[in-house]
């Protein structure tokens, strides 16, 4: 008798593990073979073996696969952490090698294959694929352009291909909206993934080296772990080093797949994060119509932080992936509640290991939601019946309980405290927050990102922020300045540092045509961005109100979605009103995280707004979504001009100036590192040149060249942007400020000892 199909598939996975492990342990295996084998061991095989378990946690086929993918990522982290913890006790000094990781992964998968329940659901057979052909063509075109566009820009060519990719992504999303009733869920989710991956890759693939902000430091700690073959938090007690999503996980991927290390960060991690909008869709689809679920995923992708910041935040990307898996578990009420609560808590434990700030915000959100739920129940009148549809689809038993809140909180405190000793930033933030709340602080404003909030103020001007920065630097260098370690203030008075003018793209023919009729294109672009930010917030509130009323809501949220949305909005309000929180954790990133909870309310608000269009409601919605996407992704400003260039579309603009790595900078850094190796002088460079070059320096380095911080004796390296444009950017209290740099100060007080027509070094 032939075994059933599900057993044959499971047996095939188990039989593949031995040959895969053998390939990993053989020397000289070509990368074309090593990469698919490593990806199989790390992701594909765990997903297939975990399906039987995830089938018991969530009820849908795609939901089971998505949850298995999130658990596979968490499993990879835990396997690497396990060998890193246990093997040194047995005398193995370098446990993070390919041999050890491949053997441990294979052993864990064998145990998983034997002990885990077996899935009786076919993987793909019988899955409906209605509407697949047009979606497949649009998705393939978008993904192809997402790679071709950055390559052209990296080679010094124009951004037309990348702009076309944004147009194709928008067309793909409009196609999904128009055909959502005729497309199967699998086709919709494949289209969402293609759109998500395209938006992320257009940014993440920029530059031939590591490009971005936080990713530079993430890559540094990854390299330190990789070089030592061992993760040791005591060697570098830094919160970044405590994020296993950017240390152990990338090391496992690099070791087992042979993918070049920079592309682990530039491609593999973004492609994993691209699953998050799909998870948003699947989670919302458990409680809402296909249109509401699709819109929720679209609004999550359309928020600018998704495609401008998240490609440079590997640790937060993995944390968001696991949090989205947790929301999938929360909204699928067709499976046993105790099991779902346990898996939810395990996923949040994975967030603890992945990113410190994300789990702190989650704990605050959960605690607020739990309190709101208790207050809601106390305020409800027993036996009171509602005349219309009940919020929560009649299910009154809530998902959140005291231990689903307490366990992640305790784990976060343990991880940041006695286990890694990296909680100093949290303690510092809480002290400043307490000072702000009780009126003993310096009363300075928070990040200017709060100006996008409905409840935010006007923000701080660049001139005011730069003056604060200069005042701070003079204050904490006063004693050393008196000892002659820094240049005297009277000498600095001759060299002002005015704020640089904002550089916009030149007006295109279309932009000039608008300008001739009296319409200011720069003002129009600014108004559109501000209006988009306010629109999303208004839609959240509108959707929330109509969901509570129940009658006209396009979807009926479960009770926990309502309380979690209250918690997320409360955290947003706290970040807006308490300055230090907006400085230490971006308000825009907090909103992106909040979208995992309240995206369906935005969708409900949008559907309510177009309800009077009747049969034309979906086409009107398509126009609204297309306009929002084209504007926020930068396609409209690129077509009109009059707005700062975006990194994904141009070789200019503020992001390009401070994040893009140049070969000239690297050559200057390597030369200076050799020159200063035997010298006692510190190397000074600006913050963003240091960020791009920190993996090359082994000498003492200071990441500021502001005149008030220039030492009397030091090396000074000016990167490409300060050299070519005489501009330097600082990041202070949550804001980027670019000022004109007085190069004549260096020409007067120092000697030029190196120049390569892109970067210079003074002594």
Region spans (language model):
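Membrane-interface helix-loop-helix junctions at transmembrane boundaries of multi-pass membrane enzymes
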Residues: 178-181, 337-338, 380-399, 511, ...
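Active-site lumenal/periplasmic loops and adjacent helix-entry segments of GT-C-fold
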Residues: 38, 157, 176-190, 194-321, ...
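Membrane-interface alpha helices of multi-pass inner-membrane proteins
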Residues: 329, 341-359
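Membrane-interface transmembrane helices that cradle and orient dolichyl/undecaprenyl
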Residues: 323-340
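Transmembrane alpha-helix segments characteristic
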Residues: 13-21, 189-197, 536-541, 549-579, ...
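Extracytoplasmic
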Residues: 427-498, 502, 520-522, 551-554, ...
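Hydrophobic/aromatic-rich transmembrane helices and adjacent perimembrane loops
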Residues: 39, 43, 161-168, 316, ...
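Membrane-embedded, hydrophobic transmembrane alpha-helices
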Residues: 1-185, 580
């Amino acid at each position: 008798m032939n075994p059933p199909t599900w057993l044959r598939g499971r047996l095939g996975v188990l039989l593949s593990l031995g040959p895969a492990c053998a390939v990993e342990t053989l020397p000289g295996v070509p990368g074309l073979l090593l990469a698919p084998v490593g990806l199989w061991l790390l992701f594909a095989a765990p997903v297939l073996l975990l399906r039987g378990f995830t089938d018991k946690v969530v009820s849908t086929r795609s939901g089971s696969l998505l949850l298995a993918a999130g658990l596979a990522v968490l499993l990879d982290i835990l396997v690497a952490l396990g060998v890193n913890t246990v093997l040194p006790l047995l005398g193995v000094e370098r446990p993070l090698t390919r041999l050890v990781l491949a053997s441990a992964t294979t052993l864990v998968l064998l145990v998983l294959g034997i002990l885990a329940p077996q899935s009786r659901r076919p993987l793909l057979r019988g899955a409906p694929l209605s509407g697949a052909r047009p979606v497949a063509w649009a998705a393939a075109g978008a993904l192809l352009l997402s790679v071709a566009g950055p390559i052209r820009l990296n080679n010094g060519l124009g951004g037309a291909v990348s702009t076309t990719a944004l147009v194709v992504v928008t067309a793909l999303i409009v196609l999904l909206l128009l055909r959502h009733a005729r497309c199967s869920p699998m086709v919709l989710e494949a289209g969402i993934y293609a759109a998500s991956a395209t938006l992320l890759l257009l940014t993440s693939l920029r530059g031939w080296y590591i490009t971005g902000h936080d990713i530079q430091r993430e890559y540094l700690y990854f390299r330190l772990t990789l070089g030592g073959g061992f993760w040791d938090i005591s060697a570098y007690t830094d919160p970044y080093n405590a994020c296993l999503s950017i240390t152990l996980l990338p090391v496992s991927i690099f070791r087992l797949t042979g993918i070049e290390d920079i592309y682990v960060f530039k491609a593999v991690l973004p492609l994993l994060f691209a699953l998050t909008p799909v998870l948003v869709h699947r989670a919302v689809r458990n409680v809402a119509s296909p249109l509401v679920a699709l819109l929720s995923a679209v609004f999550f992708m359309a928020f600018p932080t998704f495609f401008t910041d998240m490609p440079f935040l590997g640790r937060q990307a993995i944390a968001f992936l696991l949090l989205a898996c947790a929301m999938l578990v929360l909204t699928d009420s067709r499976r046993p509640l105790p099991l779902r609560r346990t898996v939810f808590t395990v996923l949040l434990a994975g967030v603890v290991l992945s990113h410190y700030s994300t789990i702190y915000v989650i704990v605050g959100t959960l605690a607020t939601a739990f309190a709101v739920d208790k207050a809601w129940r106390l305020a409800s009148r027993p036996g009171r019946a509602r005349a219309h549809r009940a919020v929560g689809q009649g299910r009154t038993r809530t998902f959140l309980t005291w231990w689903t809140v307490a366990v992640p909180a305790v784990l976060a405190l343990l991880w940041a405290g006695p286990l890694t000793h990296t909680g100093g930033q949290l303690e510092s933030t809480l002290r400043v927050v307490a000072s702000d709340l009780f009126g003993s602080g310096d009363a300075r404003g928070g990040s200017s990102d709060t100006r996008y909030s409905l409840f935010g103020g006007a923000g701080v001007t660049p001139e005011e922020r730069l003056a604060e920065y200069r005042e701070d630097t003079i204050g904490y260098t006063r004693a050393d300045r008196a000892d002659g370690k820094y240049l005297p203030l009277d000498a600095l008075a001759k060299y002002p540092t005015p704020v640089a003018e904002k550089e916009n793209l030149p007006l295109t023919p279309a932009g000039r045509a608008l300008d001739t009729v009296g319409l200011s294109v720069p003002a129009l672009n600014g108004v559109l961005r501000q209006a988009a930010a306010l629109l999303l917030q208004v839609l959240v509130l509108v959707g929330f109100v109509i969901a509570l009323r129940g009658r006209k809501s396009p979807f009926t949220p479960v009770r926990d979605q309502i309380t979690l949305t209250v918690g997320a909005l409360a955290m947003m309000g706290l970040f807006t009103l308490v300055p230090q929180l907006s400085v230490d954790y971006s308000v825009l990133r907090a909103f992106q995280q909040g979208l995992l909870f309240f995206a369906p309310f935005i969708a409900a608000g949008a559907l309510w707004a177009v309800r009077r269009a009747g049969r034309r409601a979906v086409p009107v919605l398509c126009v609204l979504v297309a306009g929002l996407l084209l504007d926020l992704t930068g396609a409209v400003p690129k077509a009109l001009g009059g707005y700062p260039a975006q990194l994904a579309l141009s070789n200019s603009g503020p992001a390009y100036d401070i994040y893009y790595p140049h070969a000239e900078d690297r050559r200057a850094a390597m030369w200076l590192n050799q020159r200063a190796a035997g010298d006692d002088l510190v190397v000074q460079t600006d913050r963003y040149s240091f960020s791009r070059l920190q993996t090359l320096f082994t000498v003492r380095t200071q990441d500021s060249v502001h005149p008030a911080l220039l030492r009397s004796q030091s090396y000074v390296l000016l990167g490409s942007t300060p050299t070519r444009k005489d501009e330097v950017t600082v990041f202070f209290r949550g804001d980027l400020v670019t000022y004109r740099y007085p190069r004549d100060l260096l020409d007067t007080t120092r000697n030029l000892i190196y120049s390569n027509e892109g970067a210079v070094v003074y002594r």
